[in-house]
Amino acid sequence: MEWNGLKMIISTMEPQVSNGPTSNTSNGPSSNSRNCPSPMQTGAATDDSKTNLIVNYLPQNMTQEEFRSLFGSIGEIESCKLVRDKITGTQFEENFKDLATGTKWKPLTEEGPIFGKGQSLGYGFVNYIDPKDAEKAINTLNGLRLQTKTIKVSYARPSSASIRDANLYVSGLPKTMTQKELEQLFSQYGRIITSRILVDQVTGVSRGVGFIRFDKRIEAEEAIKGLNGQKPSGAAEPITVKFANNPSQKTSQALLSQLYQSPNRRYPGPLHHQAQRFRLDNLLNMAYGVKRFSPITIDGMTSLVGMNIPGHTGTGWCIFVYNLSPDSDESVLWQLFGPFGAVNNVKVIRDFNTNKCKGFGFVTMTNYDEAAMAIASLNGYRLGDRVLQVSFKTNKTHKS
């Protein structure tokens, strides 16, 4: 596979990829944490940590198989686990502290206490055999858009007392405060690893509660000293800032669970068109190239279920990619389409006997506008010595 050529594809689209979430969408790290150098870049990584990665901000409906497929496309994996919520009580808190700080973990079964069959908690771990593959995974997949999430891929930090218990719980926040403003408030005290603002699952309105994880515990302690009991701009009352995972606080387990178990969040993606509202007449004109239809406004994609519109599958917009080389795998499709928007899944069709690509594959994207832009940009694109043919999947398209 020509990785240099694929990296050039990403670099030409960097303005779309590198912005990162900076609003209160709570679907990924802010640009501050997104652009922080990895331990490999700073020379801070140890031998044990050069193959072990932590992946944050994964879609909650992502499966273990999809998780393995995505990272397995980079190189051979020793172990790969998507963390799920089949955890209760102190066991959750202790395991969470170990996982979040990158402590060397032992692979468990899917039915184990950490990796149960419950809903994904939005993060996981990948341990490669070759350190070069781990580095390649960071360079390739960090910042990739998956559905409404922008994933963060980094080295799992070695366990040490200085980085444990650095997660803060913040309450009393103004309902209008964004994730970016929350980070600006706390960033004066140290490097922020992740941040969250909890929102109502139905209305999408902030609950006035957030979480800040610092790089080191001492930074979190300084933030508590400086901000606990203070009134930030726009606040009607003083905010409360305290450690979220202090074992002496009985509420910490519930707070951590609340942080990672909010299903079906309705966050707009930061790197794609915010409006999901579009006109059906424009859609049909682009799809069929025929006369203008009567204007019908559609809000979201659910109204299109059952309609015979090319590419629409009920879960997204399926794109047919033809003339791939025999050596192509899923990572090629991830890298080609990821910069254009939220990708649900990719599939390369392989020959049963040789396991080589049969020359075509499929990509499903969440948003129509992003799918249409990807098609317009990549149809006719030269990849290596081949010219790609990219279009919405139709009934006549090769079956997968």
Swiss-Prot record:
> What keywords is this UniProt entry annotated with?
Cell projection, Cytoplasm, Developmental protein, Repeat, Ribonucleoprotein, RNA-binding
Q: Read off the PROSITE patterns from this record.
A: RRM
Which SMART domains did the record assign?
A: RRM
Q: What Gene3D superfamilies does the entry give? A: 3.30.70.330
Q: What GO molecular function annotations does the UniProt record carry, in alphabetical order? A: RNA binding
User: Which residues does the UniProt record annotate as the domain RRM?
Assistant: 51-158, 166-246, 317-395
The coiled-coil regions, if any, are none
Q: Polar residues: which segments have biased composition?
A: 34-44
Give the Pfam families listed for this entry: RRM_1 (PF00076)
Q: Which tissues carry this protein? A: Expression is neural-specific. In the retina, expressed in the ganglion cell layer from stage 28 onwards and in amacrine cells from stage 35 onwards. Expressed in the tailbud and adult brain; in tailbuds, expression is predominant in the cortical plate.
Q: Name one GO cellular component term.
A: dendrite
- InterPro entries on file: ELAD_HU_SF, HuD_RRM3, Hud_Sxl_RNA, Nucleotide-bd_a/b_plait_sf, RBD_domain_sf, RRM_dom
Q: Where is this region: Disordered?
A: 12-48
Biased composition (Low complexity) is annotated at 18-33
Q: Where in the cell is it found?
A: Cytoplasm; Perikaryon; Cell projection, Axon; Cell projection, Dendrite
This protein's major location comes to cytoplasm
Would you identify the family this protein belongs to, as annotated? Belongs to the RRM elav family.
This molecule's function is given as: RNA-binding protein that is involved in the post-transcriptional regulation of mRNAs. Plays a role in the regulation of mRNA stability, alternative splicing and translation. Binds to AU-rich element (ARE) sequences in the 3' untranslated region (3'UTR) of target mRNAs. Mainly play a role in neuron-specific RNA processing.
User: NCBIfam families annotated for this entry?
Assistant: ELAV_HUD_SF
The name on file for this protein is: ELAV-like protein 4
Origin species, per record, is Xenopus laevis (African clawed frog)
